[in-house]
Regions:
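Positively charged n-region of N-terminal signal peptides that target proteins for export
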Residues: 1-4
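Bacterial N-terminal signal peptides
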Residues: 7-17
């Protein structure tokens, strides 16, 4: 009878052991078509995306992307993360998708140029501002998320222009963005807990001659991946396809 009870108990407990414990962030890796943590447990990600933009957050922490609002912005997200990952209140998020909001990375003193509109226009992008606010704002927000048991996926500032061509300005922009992000020691130390989303919403990708090609997507994104890996980032990279 005792042996039968133990056998039944093992059968009941076994499936739960195959999945990671909720609220525990252990570095992830790809295993076939699954995500596994460092202990071999399957991990299913479900969460939310937000951008530290005053406008899209209804000015709850300030009215501008300026230094005097950094502390309030980080505190706001700390509270949000506490609500997103709170099983006692019925919330079970385990990942936060962090947009590197271009309101912080764009130079307010630059004039917008080019034909691309909205967040697809990168003419005001400032590498020095990305470097500054990566350390001062974005990564502190990411750390707050991790403290609350959330994985973090980081996406680049803005969205892709409608038409991309191998060797174009946007490809070079992605190389610059991810070179800065992936060379950061905090990001590398949190590889697996933090993952990188290479680009957002590409529509058309052409080869260097402006033609449709089966290899255009590979030729466009592989050089960006190479930059990231060369810097020593070993975590998951999400590549649009």
């Amino acid at each position: 009878m005792k042996k039968r009870f133990l056998a039944i108990l093992a059968a009941v407990l076994l499936p739960s052991c195959l999945f990671a414990q909720f609220g525990v962030v252990s570095p992830l890796h790809v295993n076939g078509n699954q995500l596994n943590d460092a202990y071999g447990n399957k991990v299913v990600l479900h969460g939310v995306m937000d951008t530290p933009s005053p406008y899209f957050n209804k000015y709850r922490w300030g009215y501008s992307c300026t230094d005097n609002n950094i502390s309030a912005c980080i505190s706001y997200y700390d509270k949000i993360f506490g609500a997103l990952q709170n099983p006692a209140k019925g919330t079970y998020c385990n990942i936060f998708r962090l947009h590197l909001e271009p309101g912080w990375t764009n130079d307010p003193n630059k004039k917008s140029t080019g034909s691309d509109t909205g967040e697809a226009n990168i003419s005001r992008f400032s590498a020095s501002r990305l470097q500054k606010y990566l350390d001062a704002l974005y990564l502190p927000i990411a750390q707050k998320a991790i403290n609350h048991g959330l994985y973090v996926v980081i996406r680049p500032p803005g969205v892709c222009p409608k038409d991309l061509k191998v060797g174009d300005a946007y490809q070079n922009y992605l190389k610059t963005v991810w070179n800065i992000v992936s060379s950061n020691s905090w990001v590398k130390n949190n590889s697996g807990i933090v993952s990188l989303e290479l680009a957002n919403e590409p529509v058309h990708i052409y080869n260097r001659y402006g033609q449709s090609s089966a290899t255009a997507m590979r030729d466009y994104f592989q050089p960006v991946v190479d930059v990231i890996r060369k810097n020593g980032f070993k975590g998951i990279i999400w590549i649009p396809g």
